[in-house]
Amino acid sequence: MSFLDLAKRRYATKNYDPTKKISVEQIEELKQILTLSPSSINSQPWKFTFVTDPETKSKLAAQSYMNENSINKVNLLVVFHVMEDIEHFEKRNLSILPEAWVSGFYEPLVKANGRANVKAWMQSQVYLSLGYFLSACAHMGLDATPMEGINLKMYKEILSQDGYAPLFAVTVGYADADDWAHPGNLPKSRFALDDVIASI
Ligand SMILES: Cc1cc2nc3c(=O)[nH]c(=O)nc-3n(C[C@H](O)[C@H](O)[C@H](O)COP(=O)(O)O)c2cc1C
């Protein structure tokens, strides 16, 4: 299937079929795909927690507002985290890069604009991996839902990944055949191509 057709088919699934589980092999493939996600100057300021343990998943579901039901119905929840400590990030992630990338890009164009800018830039890299991940799920025939509607403070406490702050989560599974949000029931709503694409 072409990428355009996949883009038309994928959607933020609201109701999953709890009888259809994704396999261990698919989970391992998704882990490898995320590890290969691109990032600015290959900075990789992230961690991805794959939650399959039913007890932990249920605790997280209870901290996920309107997303609770969806999390309870799938066997995989992936939590995307960003590194918290800028100094540690520079030492661990940037010191191994070609020096010119750090002195020619990171220092003058990111760091020079202040700590808030560095943090926002680091988070942007994690969001980029989300787009990559959602496309990979579609390619693998899996349904997925990105979720910012989660209690970040409680997620951090439950997952206890030292030095990493959760940003959002993604459920992965198979949609219920009657899901009201399926594009067959709820056509995709987007601005017109001419409103979002400029051709010069
Ligand atoms: C970063 C991000 C956070 C989102 N958070 C939620 C969420 O918490 N719950 C939910 O049901 N959908 C969530 N969505 C799904 C969007 O509402 C959905 O992608 C958008 O309405 C477009 O619909 P489509 O993905 O089905 O084409 C989120 C999407 C993104 C990209």
Per-region residue spans from a language model:
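N-terminal targeting/leader regions
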Residues: 1-20, 26, 33
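C-terminal helix-cap and adjacent tail motif
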Residues: 5-7, 11-15, 167-200
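Short beta->alpha linker loops
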Residues: 22, 55, 150-151
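Small-aliphatic-rich amphipathic alpha-helix that forms the alpha element of a beta-alpha
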Residues: 34-36, 78, 100-101, 106-158, ...
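Glycine-rich phosphate/pyrophosphate-binding beta-alpha loops
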Residues: 38-42
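Short secondary-structure junction motifs
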Residues: 43-46, 142, 167
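Glycine/small-residue-rich phosphate/adenosyl-binding loop
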Residues: 49-124
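A glycine-rich helix N-cap at a beta->alpha junction
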Residues: 68-71, 77-80, 161-181
